[in-house]
Amino acid sequence: MPACPALFVSAPASGQGKTSVTAGLARLHRRLGRRVRVFKTGPDFLDPMLLERASGAPVNALDLGMVGEAGCRALLADAARDADLILIEGVMGLFDGTPSSADLAVAFGVPVVAVISVKSMAQTFAAIAFGLARFRADLPFHGVLANRVGSARHAELLRQALPGDLRWLGHVPADAGIALPERHLGLHQPNDIDDLDARLDRAADVLANTALAELPPAVAFAEPDAAGPLPRALAGKRIAIARDAAFSFIYPANLALLDALGAQLRFFSPLADEPVPGDSDALFLPGGYPELHAAALAANATSAGAIRAHAAAGKPIVAECGGMVYLCDALTDVDGATTPMLGLLPGRATMQRRFAALGMQQLDTRTGPMRGHTFHYSRLDTPLEPVAAAVRPDGGAGSGEAVYRAGSIVATYMHMYWPSNPAAAAALFSGGTI
C-alpha cells in the first residue's frame, strides 16, 4: 500500500484563498526539491492549470461523483508511489455539496488544513475554526491557517483565540501580490497572468514561515481492486486535439485514457491558425474561451479550412462546450456583436451575462453511464433535434445537456469525463453510436 505525506486544503467558503495557498505550498515544496502532486476537488479546469504551473506536474480532478471512489483511489495511489507530497485543494466550503470536500478527505484519511480569510475579523476566527474541526467527528483535522491578516498584532489575537487543541499553522498577510485574478468562468489561465510566477514565489516565501513548510505525516492510500487492461479499442487511431488559450478545458485523465486505448495524440492550435494534422482519423474540440478570441478564430482560414475538410471527409469530430460553439454558424457576444464561426453545426450561440447552466451531468449510453459536468454562459439556438440528453444526477435545478449529431460531428455542452466510460469514449472517436 503506497504511502505519502498529504494535506487537504479547504476553507469555510469560496473566496478564502484556497487556490493561492495550495499553489504557494506546491511552489514552496517544489523549490525545496520535493516531487509534489496536486489534485483539485470537483470538475474545475482553471484552478488545475494554475496548480500545474506551481507544481510542475499535471493536476487531476478528484470527485467522488464524477471520477468515482475507485477512480480517485487509483489516482491517489499512483501519485503516492512517486511523490514526496500530495496536496488536494477542496471546492467551496468544507462541508458544502453532496459529496463534499469533507467526504473526500474522510474517504481517504487526508488531514484537512482550514484556510480562513480573517479580513475584518478577530476572535470569531476561532469559532469558525472550532466549528470546522468539530462538525464531523470522523474528519482528520490538521490545523488552521489565517489568511489576509492585517498585522502582527492581528495574527497574535487570532492565535490566542484558538482553543488549545486546535493547531495554529501560521498566517498569510494581506498582500495584493499573492492574490490570483479572476474572470467569468473563474480564475484566469496561467498565460494570461504576466506576473504569475512572481505571485507564486511570493506566496511560497510567505508560507515558508509557517508550519506548512514541514512535511505532514504520511497517509497510506489503498489501491483499488486490480482491473484487467483496457482493450486497445483505438489502436492506431490518430486523434487531433485543439489546445490553446481558446480551447484548453481538457482533463489530463481524458488524454491518459485515449493513450491507454491505443490512440496517437497530436495537438494543434486553431488560435495560431495551425491546420489539423493531415493524417488524423478523428478530431477533438474541447471547451475553453472561444468568445474571447472570436475575431481571431473567424480570421484564421487555415485552421477553419482543415476542420471543414475533416468534416467533409466524414471523419469523427467530438466537440464540447466552447468547441461546439466554434462549430456553429455564428457567435453573438453580450453586447450583440455577431462573429461568424465554422458553420458546420446549424445554429447560433449567444453569450449571456449570467450562468446558462452549471452542475454535474450523466449521460446514459449503450455501454453504461458517462459522467461529467456543465459550466457555460452561452445559449445555443439550433434546429437540430438532440440525439440524446444527459440528466442531473445530483437532482439539481435545470435540465441535462443535449447531445447533437450532424454528419460525423457529435457535440454537446457537457464536459465528459471519459474514464467513467472508456467504451463510450472509444465509440465517440471511432464514429460509432454511443
Segment roles from a protein language model:
Residues F8, L87-E89, V113-V115, L145, ...:
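Structural motif
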Residues P2-F108, V112, I116-H142, A152-E156:
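ATP-dependent carboxylate-amine ligase catalytic core
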Residues A179-A226, A235-G236, R348-I434:
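Amide-donor transfer/coupling interface in amidating biosynthetic enzymes
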Residues K237-A312:
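Phosphate-binding active sites in nucleotide-utilizing proteins
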Residues A122-P231:
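Internal gly/pro-rich beta-alpha loop/helix module
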Residues P290-Q362:
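Cysteine-nucleophile active-site neighborhood
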Residues A6, R34-R37, R238, Q264, ...:
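Residues that mark the start of a beta-strand
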Residues V110, L166, A312-P316:
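A short helix->loop->beta-strand "cap" motif at the edges of active sites that frequently abuts
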